[in-house]
């Protein structure tokens, strides 16, 4: 495996090097977390805000569902692109995936199909459905642009150029701002369409920028001698990648599950009202953990030569994230966040406290999960990751059913208990699996 620039070729890997490698990736996830609220804030300041916010939310959800199978292309290129032939093989696979998701988007906006989705299936009012159709049409190139971008981002991460990934995200947000402002001032488009156009243009510009920024890394890929190693085949890529794609799709079930059960719980309105606020706060501290998966893939090494250093950095970041979150949730800062920052009235701020406090260990568990996943990715055992994700979602469903259906708990509290329980099941499953396999780093942190 080609060693990233952030990793010294010999000896140990300094924890400070790992942290500097991780920092721009974490910043990228933080900026991406801000993207949704940012677009929503733009739409909220335009005419017919309620209809357009609803329409944008539906259009984004549809596009996100279509896009989910290509989310792991960054991980795939980080793990698999070691030379020129593997680059060409995975690029061919990426193009095919992009063509497939674009075809699905095109089919989805065909009038008969779209009416079936938004009318028969979702029951949207006609005025909202029309706005959704226009916004979804604008988002047709969005999934493929994300796939293209993530393919080249993975190559940059592998070569120790994680900062360039963050630069691309900044460029995307700037493009979104310019597009939204220009269209709001000089076009007749509705807010939902302007939000979709801002989102699509930002990702397209970032995709082009990622290709340009990855140019030197691609040029540096070695050409192996004939017969030096077996080439990376399309069949091998599919075998490696389809469990990762399935993992992304399964993960999407969590949100609807929480919403479904909370709507049937005690205090459903209050639970649904505080859910996005609590989740947003916790994700601020989880986002660095999501980014840590790419750190593990890039730096642990194919044979696990840097596993101890990466595990040490993992412990520092994981416990640090949960301790800082606890410092917010178990002090007066909690009310400052929920009331002054998030704008919740005092009764809902009080209501949000217990569900949020239950999730205090979720950031640490996110880091642990990313570290565990990275080791299985390096060994090519991606099916184990899919099984762990399915177990997590199944655990969430079972705990929700038990807490709400049998114990009559408040929905928000049950939701937090379910998320912690599901994640713990996933962590423990991967811990157990690592003990019986040869994933890199099995002797450290499970």
Which residue stretches match the model-derived regions?
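Hydrophobic faces of transmembrane alpha-helices in multi-pass small-molecule transporters and flippases
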Residues: 10-34, 136-140, 166-167, 209, ...
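Interhelical loop/hinge segments that connect adjacent transmembrane helices in multipass membrane
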Residues: 1-23, 128-130, 189-199, 205-252, ...
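Transmembrane helix-bundle signature of multi-pass secondary active exporters and lipid flippases
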Residues: 23-75, 242-298, 324, 359-366
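Hydrophobic alpha-helical transmembrane segments
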Residues: 135-136, 168-182, 186-219, 410-436
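Alpha-helical transmembrane segments of multi-pass membrane transporters/permeases
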Residues: 91, 155-182, 292, 307-318, ...
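Small-residue-rich hydrophobic transmembrane alpha-helices
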Residues: 55-106, 149-157, 275-328, 370-377, ...
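Alpha-helical transmembrane segments of multi-pass membrane proteins
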Residues: 126-151, 346-372
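Short membrane-interface helical motifs at transmembrane helix boundaries
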Residues: 103-133, 324-353
């Amino acid at each position: 495996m080609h060693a990233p620039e952030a990793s010294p070729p010999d000896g140990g890997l300094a924890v400070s090097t790992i942290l500097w490698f991780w920092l721009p990736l974490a910043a990228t996830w933080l900026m991406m977390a801000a993207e949704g609220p940012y677009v929503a804030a733009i739409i909220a300041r335009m005419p017919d805000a309620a209809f357009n916010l609803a329409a944008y939310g539906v259009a984004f959800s549809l596009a996100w569902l279509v896009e989910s199978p290509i989310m792991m292309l960054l991980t795939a290129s980080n793990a698999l692109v070691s030379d020129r032939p593997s680059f060409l093989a995975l690029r061919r696979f990426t193009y095919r995936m992009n063509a497939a998701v674009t075809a699905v988007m095109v089919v989805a906006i065909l009038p008969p199909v779209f009416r079936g989705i938004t009318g028969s299936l979702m029951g949207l009012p006609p005025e909202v459905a029309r706005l959704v159709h226009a916004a979804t049409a604008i988002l047709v190139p969005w999934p493929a642009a994300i796939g293209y971008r993530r393919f080249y981002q993975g190559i940059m991460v592998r070569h120790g150029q994680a900062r360039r990934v963050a630069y691309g995200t900044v460029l995307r947000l700037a493009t979104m701002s310019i597009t939204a402002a220009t269209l709001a001032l000089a076009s007749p488009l509705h807010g939902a369409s302007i939000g979709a156009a801002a989102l699509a243009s930002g990702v397209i510009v970032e995709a082009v920028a990622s290709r340009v920024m990855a140019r030197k890394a691609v040029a540096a890929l070695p050409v192996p001698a004939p017969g030096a190693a077996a080439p990376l085949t399309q069949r091998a890529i599919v075998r490696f990648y389809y469990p990762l794609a399935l993992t992304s799709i399964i993960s999407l079930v969590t949100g609807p599950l929480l919403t479904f059960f909370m709507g049937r719980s005690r205090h459903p309105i209050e639970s649904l009202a505080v859910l996005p606020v609590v989740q947003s706060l916790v994700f601020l501290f989880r986002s660095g953990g999501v980014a840590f998966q790419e750190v593990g893939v890039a730096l642990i090494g194919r044979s696990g030569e840097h596993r101890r250093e990466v595990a040490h950095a993992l412990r520092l970041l994981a416990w640090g994230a949960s301790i800082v979150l606890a410092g917010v949730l178990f002090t007066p800062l909690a009310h400052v966040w929920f009331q002054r920052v998030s704008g919740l009235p005092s009764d809902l701020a009080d209501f949000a406290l217990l569900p949020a406090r239950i999730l205090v260990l979720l950031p640490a568990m996110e880091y642990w999960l990313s570290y565990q996943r990275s080791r299985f990715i390096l060994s090519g055992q991606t099916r184990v990751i899919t099984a762990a994700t399915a177990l997590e979602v199944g655990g969430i469903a079972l705990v929700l059913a038990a807490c709400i259906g049998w114990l009559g708990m408040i929905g928000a509290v049950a939701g937090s208990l379910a998320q912690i329980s599901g994640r713990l099941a996933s962590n423990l499953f991967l811990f157990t699996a690592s003990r019986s396999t040869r994933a890199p780093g099995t002797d450290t942190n499970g």
